[in-house]
């Protein structure tokens, strides 16, 4: 029942959250009060972030390793957790593993010859281990900066001093134990960010977390960069394969699962799907994949994008579509 807001919110901030199945009819009832639904969804996420920050403080760890699959919201969530730590008096810094890329010329390739962007060998693992070891022992290190325009490491660096605080290391390989091999166990706290809400009609699952993530990634690229969904859709199977090989196997090593689901997001996606389909021409398998995904949202009441708060995590994916 949507009136039981306190019970719902408590359920959604447990440390390890099983996936929950929400009836689309129940969502549609809640969508009749869109502002209240959006407020509840946003409040629930903020409470989950605050709880994650509390668990980090309780652990006394200096280094937080935060990962999640593509479009799980891990990057923005890392910054949200850092903000929550700062608000409670704990200095916090976010480190992106993207800055440890070796460079395009060093990327491994898949059997078909294409670049394997998901492979951990794209990263300078030895440098990551050294930087994390420095932070663990001295609280200081020098970080590389990656230049995405040239796809190579910049000559510039960044000096980081934790000043008694915490660093949050975010990236798809953050839970890979090779990264923290030189850091003592008590100094590391591990978080897996992922969606935990799926949707059903008469008990039959019709929208799963992969569907939501595909929409997030595709709609973000279309709205923010004017990019056709063709490239995103064409890469999707490869992305999922990389997650299976390199990310999900370490999920059970996490100390905390940060749920990045927003119930009202369902209506935002429903609003945007048709717009993107009319804006771009899709063909072949990509058209079939997108149309099949769109059909899953046929019974979802759409919501206005203006419901998105300025500081919402979802702005990472839909902010550019808000007029």
Predicted regions and their residues:
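Hydrophobic anchor at the beta1->P-loop junction of P-loop NTPases
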Residues: 64-66
């Amino acid at each position: 029942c949507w009136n039981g807001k306190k019970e719902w919110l408590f359920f959604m901030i447990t440390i390890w959250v099983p996936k929950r199945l929400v009836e689309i009819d129940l969502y549609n009832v809640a969508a009749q009060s869109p502002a209240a639904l959006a407020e509840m969804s946003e409040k629930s996420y903020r409470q989950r972030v605050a709880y994650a920050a509390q668990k980090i403080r309780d652990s006394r760890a200096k280094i937080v390793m935060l990962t999640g699959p593509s479009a799980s919201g891990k990057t923005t969530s890392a910054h949200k957790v850092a903000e929550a730590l700062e608000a409670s008096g704990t200095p916090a810094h976010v480190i992106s593993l993207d800055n440890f890329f070796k460079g395009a010329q060093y990327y491994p390739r898949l059997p078909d010859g294409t670049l394997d962007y998901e492979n951990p060998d794209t990263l300078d693992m030895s440098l990551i281990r050294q930087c994390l070891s420095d932070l663990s022992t001295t609280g200081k290190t020098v970080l590389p900066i990656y230049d995405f325009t040239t796809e190579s490491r910049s000559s510039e660096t960044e000096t980081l001093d934790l000043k008694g605080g915490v660093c949050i290391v975010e990236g798809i390989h953050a839970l890979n134990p090779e990264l923290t091999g030189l850091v003592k166990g008590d100094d590391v706290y591990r978080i897996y960010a992922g969606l935990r809400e799926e949707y059903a009609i008469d008990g039959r699952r019709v929208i799963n977390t992969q569907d939501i993530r595909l929409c997030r990634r595709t709609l973000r690229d279309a709205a923010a960069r004017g990019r056709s969904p063709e490239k995103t859709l064409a890469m999707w199977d490869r992305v999922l394969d990389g997650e299976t090989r390199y990310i999900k196997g370490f999920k059970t090593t996490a100390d905390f699962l940060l749920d990045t689901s927003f119930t009202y997001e369902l209506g935002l996606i429903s609003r945007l799907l048709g717009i993107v389909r009319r804006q771009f021409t899709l063909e072949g398998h990509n058209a079939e994949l997108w149309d099949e995904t769109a059909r899953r949202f046929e019974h979802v009441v759409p919501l206005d994008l203006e419901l998105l708060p300025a500081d919402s995590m979802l702005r990472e994916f839909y902010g550019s579509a808000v007029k």
